[in-house]
From Swiss-Prot:
CDD domains, per database record: class1_nsHb-like (cd14784)
Induction: Accumulates upon salt (NaCL), drought, cold and asbcisic acid (ABA) treatment and in response to osmotic stress (mannitol). Induced in nutrient deficient conditions (e.g. K(+) and Ca(2+) deprivation), but down-regulated in resupply conditions.
Role summary: Phytoglobin that reduces nitrite to nitric oxide under anoxic conditions (e.g. during flooding or in waterlogged soil). May not function as an oxygen storage or transport protein. Has an unusually high affinity for O(2) through an hexacoordinate heme iron because of a very low dissociation constant. Promotes tolerance to low potassium K(+) conditions.
Site (Homodimerization): K140
Name this polypeptide is given: Anaerobic nitrite reductase NSHB2
Catalytic activity, as annotated: Fe(III)-heme b-[protein] + nitric oxide + H2O = Fe(II)-heme b-[protein] + nitrite + 2 H(+)
Keyword Iron in record: yes
Globin domain span: 16-159
Organism: Oryza sativa subsp. indica (Rice)
Keyword list, A-Z: Cytoplasm, Heme, Iron, Metal-binding, Nucleus, Oxidoreductase, Oxygen transport, Stress response, Transport
Tissue expression per record: Mainly expressed in germinating seeds, seedlings, roots, flowers and leaves.
Length: 162
């Protein structure tokens, strides 16, 4: 299954992960999508718990007196980020989205350490969101691989906006 689609994708073509990995991501997503807004918010709260200074990378959080968990702009942003891999029932991200993500992450100085914190927060959030008997090393690996591929694609596009 292609994770990145479009004319150029990653390294000149689509990057894929196994059907088993895709099935695990889709199975867990089917459980989480009913509460994706709250799960997305918990994901960002986990990021800020691990790396409090990360909140300053978001213009809508700087100088805000609204508690993070009640910030409507964070809730909206969290929802959009959390469902990104699940557009149109596929585990894909379009080239145009990657270009925008790359430019945005470049603009705000996102680096490897930020991506690592985000990976940790994502995996912990999913682990807490799915039933205990569903979470497994294979599911963790599947989500980690999907995330790794997304990050690799974003990094290829990390340059100033044109």
């Amino acid at each position: 299954m292609a994770l990145v689609e479009g004319n150029n994708g990653v390294s000149g073509g689509a990057v894929s992960f196994s059907e088993e990995q895709e099935a695990l991501v889709l199975k867990s997503w089917a459980i989480m999508k009913k509460d994706s807004a709250n799960i997305g918010l918990r994901f960002f709260l986990k990021i800020f718990e691990v790396a409090p200074s990360a909140s300053q990378m978001f213009s809508f959080l700087r100088n805000s007196d609204v508690p993070l968990e009640k910030n409507p702009k964070l809730k909206t942003h969290a929802m959009s980020v959390f469902v990104m891999l699940r557009k149109a029932g596929k585990v894909t991200v379009r080239d145009t989205t990657l270009k925008r993500l790359g430019a945005t992450h470049f603009k705000y100085g996102v680096g490897d350490a930020h991506f690592e914190v985000t990976r940790f927060a994502l995996l912990e959030t999913i682990k807490e969101a799915v039933p205990v008997d569903m979470w497994s090393p294979a599911m963790k690996s599947a989500w980690s691989e999907a995330y790794n591929q997304l990050v690799a694609a974003i990094k290829q596009e990390m340059k100033p906006a044109e």
